[in-house]
């Protein structure tokens, strides 16, 4: 995939109507936004366009309204909060049809530097099917398209891909530019040693990621629930731990591939186990890689955490996707904390691949110590799988 895409700085936006696809899919509680990270992430692009005198039309989806208006998934709270953050009114074009009379009128009345936010794009069933009719309607509002929603870049929808067929100029915003810089460099031209850490519950979620990264990394570290399928493939007992029986053979193949490629493949040498899945369960650290009957692995052990931390310390590039254990339970958060700490203390380029690892890093207070925290869980996984992301591919090359 070509990562060298035109950015907003490469196009003249003065007095032009610029449709910006943002990711405002934020959590709401009784109409209040509970996590503003995605709004903060959009600000640099919006501010740049304001300064350059563009007419800014923002659009995004929120949740899954399944192609019909749902009041609780309206973007009104986003418009209100953005107005406060930008110190400028963001006009909300409340329109069940997204591009109806309200939206058209709001756009018509715009002056340079003004901002309009359209209603939830998924109010229209055509959006997720990438149907021409809605793509054309969205494109009809603007002269230029800017995609700044990395979180939906792996989806070919009207507001991410379809519009680019009807607007000649399509560029990326600062958020996507940063994602492409960090993830693209890591996958294509990493500084070495290059270490990837994969955790989370399932091997099946990361099959293509493991396979693709083994062609690129110097060390691959495995933790989390997926580790037990690998340990089982080596003949260890896993007790009641999470196990994907149908992936044991695949795990064996990957361990062999690592040997062939000369990749250092690290698995847990000890495990923090408990007799039940409960935040108050007593944590016991095993002597070796075996989990006894009646017990389940809920975190990597302390010896393993030290080995993983040492591997991170010697790296020049580190990518992490997926926690080492059940970090939501204090008794089983240590492995995840130790990995985050080692990355925070490192001089390497450190990249967190979105999702649960991003949540963990922020909860434990290491967020600002990382080089980059990806804003897209699914998108960053597909990126690491080596797949082309439709929302990026659709933009103009430099």
Curated annotation (Swiss-Prot):
Pathway named in the protein's UniProt entry: Carbohydrate degradation; glycolysis; pyruvate from D-glyceraldehyde 3-phosphate: step 2/5
Molecular-function annotations in GO: ADP binding; ATP binding; phosphoglycerate kinase activity
Binding site residues for ATP: 206, 297, 328, 354-357
EC number, as in UniProt: 2.7.2.3
InterPro entries found in the cross-reference section: Phosphoglycerate_kinase (IPR001576), Phosphoglycerate_kinase_CS (IPR015911), Phosphoglycerate_kinase_N (IPR015824), Phosphoglycerate_kinase_sf (IPR036043)
Keywords, in A-Z order: ATP-binding, Cytoplasm, Glycolysis, Kinase, Nucleotide-binding, Transferase
Pfam families named in the record: PGK
Catalytic activities: (2R)-3-phosphoglycerate + ATP = (2R)-3-phospho-glyceroyl phosphate + ADP
Signal peptide: none
Top-level taxonomic group: Bacteria
Location of the protein in the cell: Cytoplasm
Positions that bind substrate: 23-25, 38, 61-64, 122, 155
One GO BP annotation of this record: gluconeogenesis
GO cellular component labels: cytosol
Assembly description: Monomer.
Family per record: Belongs to the phosphoglycerate kinase family.
Official protein name in the record: Phosphoglycerate kinase
Originating species: Clostridium botulinum (strain Loch Maree / Type A3)
